[in-house]
Amino acid sequence: MSDHPGPGAVTPELFGVGGDWLAVTAGESGASVFRAADATRYAKCVPAADAAGLEAERDRIAWLSGQGVPGPRVLDWYAGDAGACLVTRAVPGVPADRVGADDLRTAWGAVADAVRRLHEVPVASCPFRRGLDSVVDAARDVVARGAVHPEFLPVEQRLVPPAELLARLTGELARRRDQEAADTVVCHGDLCLPNIVLHPETLEVSGFIDLGRLGAADRHADLALLLANARETWVDEERARFADAAFAERYGIAPDPERLRFYLHLDPLTWG
């Protein structure tokens, strides 16, 4: 290993995975991510308690790679008493949050095209569900454990008790369920700029990464995260609104602002 993860981290070496690996991140969930020295592979390792979640991510990557949507491919899978390790082919390029506003504006049409292709995958063929009720159940669990990350919340909500934030949203569930039933697509589940990889020269989309939350859901669950996250790159609100309009035109559907708001406020309550 050319770099070292934190103490107690599960590493590729524990599973006999060959090669020289560099530690990239260690997530709060206990997951550790490593990049091969030649940048062709990634390894994600978790302790045994989190192996089922990583196995679910493996299955989603394997399924999506057969749907004509660019992304990683599963190369190896290891599981044992120490935990589990998923090795995938790297998606070449640079995450879209690491390019400036000018480059993101150039890439924006390609991003809209790629998201549309993902959402056009026949939803009946998708074996994974990320329905609204299951997402709300996850939020209830996170809130009950007091595990909501305040920094994930909009600034204006950070002093509001998470239970109150969730109660505001659950009052809308009947309407949102009906909308989901009428507009379910294959969603990425965490469609923010770091999970969209761009070719550094052409600025075309090389692929989607971090697919652990992929599943059938209301398309607005994806669009809310993407459009809000892109606002961190656009230099002002006028350009952000122009980008939103350009995305809608290229994507082919004008998003519903109220559904965008709902999913944008629900998502931060599901991480913890």
UniProtKB/Swiss-Prot annotation:
Q: Report if keyword Transcription is assigned.
A: no
Q: Does the keyword Lipid metabolism apply?
A: no
The protein here is known as Streptomycin 3''-kinase
Under the heading PANTHER family, the entry gives:
3'-PHOSPHOTRANSFERASE, PUTATIVE-RELATED, AMINOGLYCOSIDE PHOSPHOTRANSFERASE-RELATED-RELATED
Q: What's the catalysed reaction?
A: streptomycin + ATP = streptomycin 3''-phosphate + ADP + H(+)
Entries under Gene3D superfamilies matching the protein: 3.90.1200.10, Phosphorylase Kinase, domain 1
Reported EC number(s) for this entry are 2.7.1.87
Q: One biological-process term from Gene Ontology? A: response to antibiotic
The family database entries (Pfam families) matched by this protein are listed as: APH
Question: Care to name a GO molecular-function term for this sequence?
Answer: ATP binding
- Describe the function of this protein: The aminoglycoside phosphotransferases achieve inactivation of their antibiotic substrates by phosphorylation.
Q: Which UniProt keywords apply?
A: Antibiotic resistance, ATP-binding, Kinase, Nucleotide-binding, Transferase
Q: Which residues form the active site?
A: D190 (proton acceptor)
Family designation: Belongs to the aminoglycoside phosphotransferase family.
